[in-house]
């Protein structure tokens, strides 16, 4: 996000205000860097949120467990040090292009409706979808609420992920997330891997495990970040700034632009 957020990542003003108020109270729960304090932290968080959060969402919070997979992934993050050619080779750029072109043809009506609504063509959406999850093949298998709760408890970025947890609990109330939802290690979900707050901000209704929902949300994200219909999206062109909002890594941004143009060229 960096992207949609992995890690960046409006909702209506009243919802935003509610979340801000919720966060201000919830931040009083004591963070920690080992599993030993997690259950106590959950109780503190729930006690402070009671009366503002629903019983259903708090029950979902209390059902979470400390995610060692999430902590391992978080501590093991590495910066992008590959050049563009190396990065594309590692990500299977040619496969993304060929599969993306086929999916563009197979889903022509969907992509036409998305472009009409948001001004975003198929190419960059397919490039993002292919790079994020291999067109849905690899969406992650970590419990989403446990991942986000673990990172909200963890002291390294507690404030950021407390905000994500508040959003996740709102999504539980809306039926978009459940205690069984699974995704990537930092709480990203769906075909294009949105963090909970981005689902709340840019989602267009329903789970992002639905392809149309995920692609519409992705186009909505790009439009909200300044995408202009018909303008170019290569480096130096107007819409590249919207792609930069998706992921902070320069090589990732350039890969989206290049793969998208190759998909759109046919």
Task: Identify what each model region corresponds to.
Residues 1-6:
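N-terminal secretory signal peptides that target proteins for export/translocation
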Residues 7-8, 12, 29:
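Secreted/extracellular small peptides and ectodomain modules produced from precursors
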Residues 10-21:
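Bacterial N-terminal signal peptides
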Residues 22-28:
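Sec/Tat signal peptide C-region and signal peptidase I cleavage site
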Residues 30-65:
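N-terminal mature-domain "stem" immediately C-terminal to a signal peptide or N-terminal signal-anchor/transmembrane
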Residues 53-266:
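Catalytic glycan-binding domains that act on GlcNAc-containing polysaccharides
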């Amino acid at each position: 996000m960096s992207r949609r957020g992995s890690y960046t990542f409006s909702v209506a003003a009243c919802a935003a205000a509610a979340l801000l108020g919720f966060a201000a109270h919830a931040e009083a729960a004591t963070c920690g860097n080992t599993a030993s304090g997690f259950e106590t932290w959950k109780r503190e968080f729930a006690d402070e949120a009671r009366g503002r959060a629903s019983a259903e969402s708090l029950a979902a919070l209390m059902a979470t467990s400390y995610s060692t997979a999430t902590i391992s992934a978080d501590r093991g993050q590495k910066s992008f040090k590959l050049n563009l050619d190396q990065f594309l080779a590692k990500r299977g750029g040619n496969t993304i292009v060929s599969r993306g072109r086929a999916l563009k043809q197979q889903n022509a009506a969907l992509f036409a409706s998305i472009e009409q609504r948001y001004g975003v063509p198929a190419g960059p959406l397919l490039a993002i979808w292919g790079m994020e999850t291999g067109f849905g093949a690899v969406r992650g298998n970590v419990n989403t609420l446990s991942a986000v709760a673990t990172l909200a408890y963890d002291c390294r970025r507690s404030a950021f992920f407390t905000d994500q947890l508040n959003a996740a609990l709102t999504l539980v109330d809306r039926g978009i997330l459940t205690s069984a939802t699974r995704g990537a290690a930092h709480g990203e979900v769906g075909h294009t891997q949105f963090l909970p707050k981005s689902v709340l901000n840019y989602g267009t209704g329903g789970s992002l495990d639905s392809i149309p929902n995920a692609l519409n949300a992705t186009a909505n994200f790009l439009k909200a970040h300044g995408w202009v219909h018909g303008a170019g999206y290569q480096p130096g062109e107007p819409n590249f700034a919207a792609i930069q909002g998706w992921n902070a890594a320069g090589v990732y941004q350039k890969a989206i632009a290049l793969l998208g143009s190759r998909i759109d060229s046919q």
